[in-house]
């Protein structure tokens, strides 16, 4: 999600998907998705909920410029593998209730949450540059990183004006497939831009 406040959206509105696979991470009383979590759902003090190996997908529809236009409509998709505590933690994180640099920034832009579903989410990494996400009946997304002058180095956006990975420059990709159909919204962004990277969210 890379934007510039002075450039209007090509089609007059913005619509897309953001997906997260949590390698390792935990939730305490704020957002903390990192690579140092415990292996159980909660730590010895029952104060930290393990979120490792879970997926989250968010659909976003902004009826204008995402930064300066009308507020967004979003829908949240949580990994069905998550237990109730994990679902509650993920909901708080990805709706901005738990804070965190990126989520605090987008919270005022959200006008409506269309729904929160617990669904099977398939996530796959193929080599360095390919990522796939699928939610049966709702989402299909495949992206592939672009090849730069040196094919062994991933091309990236340096210092973007807005990003869902603050402080981390994302790699540039192209969506070979990107379809969505739910909550009365439907689109096909196949062939358009995409981004990916590894990162850490902290409170």
What are these regions (language model features)?
Residues 27-32, 37-63:
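A structural-propensity feature for long, helix-poor, extended segments
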Residues 1-27:
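N-terminal ordered "arm"
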Residues 10-12, 48-50, 68:
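A generic structural signal for short, solvent-exposed coil/turn residues
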Residues 13, 31-33, 73, 87:
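Domain-exit/linker segments immediately C-terminal to small folded modules
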Residues 4, 8, 43-46, 102, ...:
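A generic short-segment signal for beta-strand/edge and adjacent turn/coil regions
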Residues 51-203:
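Internal, well-folded beta-alpha domain core
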